Regions:
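All-alpha prenyltransferase/terpene-synthase fold signal
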Residues: 1-315
């Protein structure tokens, strides 16, 4: 799918231009910053693994990346995040208004592009997905500064706000190839499990010394009052003193550096990171098993490698 992938990278840049110069300036900056483009790649691999022979997958892979980027622009404003992939965020450079408007532009351009495919199933899939992403982010916002969040709720949130777009990317590959329902469901499960593992690893990296090396702002989730899996584990399994520290820190709008570092040390000295990594490993095992419904081919093998890459970012 190398040629397909390059076609998507080209289209991502060309279709993001606008007669509004500020929009073009920001989108050009966004799409030359790098990024793994895992979601578009997943869609391409799943379509080809299902023996799809058309070119609508190029358009839909572009749509997936636009939706993903739009959510990042909006999320960074909501979270007041100043770094993404090790560089200043759009709202830090151009202001909240510009970042929000460019996010809106990318959403609308995504829907313009998907109408070119002319498939109501595709439209319905994207409509459901964008709704789910918004609900997941709202759920996370509601539970900010809440130390009592359960693992079940944590998983619900990350499946909605992160894993859903992976699920859609994989599922669309089967829809384009007009696969039977069983194969479509299998690929959707594959995407959902990969996306869940991807977010768990991302949450581990917030407390890892490796986080900064891949462009993450260390302890950003903790500073924003977000309870993710490593912190959740420590809160449930830690000492009374550690629980008090977590409660105080999470419920404080501006925690001190000493509080943040004390929690990071406690997490690194506990079993929290191995516990979270083990859960991510299980998600990847389930993702790979879900691909058993496909006959062996090079794109299926590549999809398995993509799943393992999501896990191995920590290594």
């Amino acid at each position: 799918v190398r040629a397909d992938f390059h076609a998507v990278l080209t289209q991502i840049k060309t279709q993001a231009s606008s007669k509004a110069r500020l929009v073009t300036t920001i989108t050009e900056d966004l799409f030359t910053q790098g990024g793994k483009r895992l979601r578009p790649l997943m869609l391409l691999l799943c379509a080809r693994a299902c023996a799809y022979r058309g070119d609508a997958h190029i358009v839909l892979a572009t749509v997936i990346e636009y939706i993903h980027t739009a959510t990042l622009l909006h999320d960074d404003v909501v979270d007041n995040s100043h770094l993404r992939r090790g560089k200043p965020t759009a709202h830090t450079r151009w202001g909240n208004e510009a970042a929000i408007l460019v996010g809106d532009f990318l959403y609308s351009r995504a829907f313009q592009l998907m109408t070119q495919v002319g498939d109501t199933r595709v439209m319905q899939c994207f409509a459901d997905t964008t709704n789910c992403l918004a609900e997941g982010e709202a759920q996370q916002l509601l539970n900010r500064h809440n130390p009592e969040i359960s693992q079940s709720l944590y998983l619900d949130i990350i499946r909605s706000k992160t894993a859903k777009l992976f699920e859609t990317a994989a599922q669309l590959g089967a829809i384009l190839a007009d696969m039977p329902q069983a194969i479509e469901a299998g690929l959707a499960r594959y995407g959902l499990h990969v996306g869940t593992a991807f977010q768990i690893i991302d949450d581990i990296l917030d407390y890892s010394d490796d986080g900064a090396s891949i462009g993450k702002n260390p302890l950003q989730d903790l500073q924003e009052g977000k309870v993710t899996l490593p912190l959740l584990y420590l809160y449930e399994q830690g000492s009374p003193a550690e629980k008090r520290l977590i409660r105080t820190t999470i419920m404080t709008e501006m925690p001190s550096e000493s509080q943040l570092n004390a929690i990071k040390t406690a997490i690194q000295e506990s079993h929290a990171i191995p516990y979270a990594y083990n859960l991510a490993e299980k998600e990847i095992e389930q993702a790979i098993s879900a691909l058993d419904i496909l006959s062996d081919n090079p794109c299926k093998t590549a999809a398995i490698h993509l799943a393992r890459f999501a896990l191995n970012r920590l290594q």
